Structure formats: structure tokens, C-alpha cells
Amino acid sequence: MGTTLEILHTGTVIVDRALPYHRPGDPPLSWTHAFRGRDDLIAVPVSTYLVENSHGLTLIDTGWHPVNRSRLGQMANLRHQYPVNKADLPEGRAIDEQLEERGIRPRDLDLLLMSHLHCDHA
């Protein structure tokens, strides 16, 4: 059996372009989006990875939690990160919804690997 990799996008994170692409000449603290316009906002995909090989089925990362669909949910879940990061998670794009579309139940996963532990999905 070979290895298959499927990239599953679980919405986007809306941030100031200075957060991922800080350039010389950007104002100090521009990554916070303080005193900057809507034109400085960008949407960055929040991705997970489904890997299937002879060792089984592995999910790498879990993406946005559905609680982040509401503003209050984001404020509670993202806490101090909320002013800098805004979640956009359309219906049907949460990881559990996408796995269900594929006929995969959480118990079918052999391994869940978290690449990092942010408050939004850890």
C-alpha cells in the first residue's frame, strides 16, 4: 500500500498581513492590526492533513473548533489572541464534519498528531 495525503482546509484565520509577512518598514506592532485598515487584513488557510499508509490513518492537526463560528465563542476560546486572530469557519468545514463526509469516525484514526498547541485547538 502506498501513502496518500489529503489536505483539509478548516476555514481561515484573518490576520494583519504584517503577522506572517513582517517587512522592514512596517510600523511597530503592525502585526496587532492596531491603527491599520481593512486592506491590511489577509485570510490564511487553517489546514489539517489526513495521511493513510500501511501504518494506518493519521490526522495531523485539527484546525478550528466549531465554537469559533461565533464572535462570543472566539472571544472565549481565543482569549488574548482574539484581537489579533479572527476565525472564519464555514459550516461543513470543521474537521469532524469533513471526516464524517468521508465516512471516517474519530475512532477510525490510528494517530492524531498535533504540530503545535494553540488555545484554539489544543
Question: Where is each model-derived feature located?
Answer:
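Well-ordered alpha/beta subsegment
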Residues: 99-104
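Glycine-rich nucleotide phosphate-binding loop and flanking beta-alpha elements
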Residues: 66, 120-121
